[in-house]
Amino acid sequence: MEKYVSSMTCADFIVSTPDYFRYNPADEFITPEQIGEIAANTKASLSGTGYAVRKPAYLWMTEDALRQDYARYESAEQLDSHMSRLEHRGNMVMGDTRIEALDNSLFDKLQVLDGDISPMLEPDNNAIAIAVSLDDYGNLPNPEYYPKVGDTITATYADDVKYIDSRTGELRTEDTPEEYFQEKLYGARDVEYTVCALVELPNSMSYRYGGTGYDAVLSVDTAQRDSGGAAIPMLYLFDTADEVDEAEAEQYLSKLTAGEFSPLMYESKATARSEFAQFR
């Protein structure tokens, strides 16, 4: 049972909003005030916040790597057309990305496969960790897809993104065929990072969805600096020291989140154990 529990959650408790747990887009998740209230009413041996970067962000990657992503959805002809509409810098293209920021305390939850995450703990750092996808045996099936530790990788942040018609350079209309959609960035700026590690980011403390391009992790201070303060709390996570503290926290959160219209939800190891018991 504990193997199942560990696969379902990486912490004793994870708290956020229903939107987060139900994969709904939102402008706001759990608030600092709500986190403070929970922290004041529970006894944590480890705690911290995961943040969503709420600003358009991209990581530059090789065209071959991005082609691997889109080859799952597009024909060869569609793929060639798609790649031709992307901005290129040599053999590099601008790929979508999901950047999550973490409090320093939560770096303990990452499994480091290569490299070292300690540079991310230093003040005013430019270190980034790339989150990788492992197979069922814990192996990295496609290492060539990812940048290497020590590589410099460029992130582009933008204030806004709109789609234009690549034939005219004007904003797209409802009559513009999809093959002519092209992104146009406003207020774009580049930041160069050094890849310090390849890590496994537990799904239960991530965005909980994937996509094309890289998933990446920054320290919250670095993310706030480079995104212009666009990192907002997405989840609050904590562990407890013993069964007594765990039971008390479970009781508190159960009451806090009771009711159909509660602004908060939570997952815990206790709820995962309950789910496992129902499966048996």
Predicted ranges, named:
Residues 2-277:
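Basic-flanked hydrophobic alpha-helices used for secretion and membrane insertion
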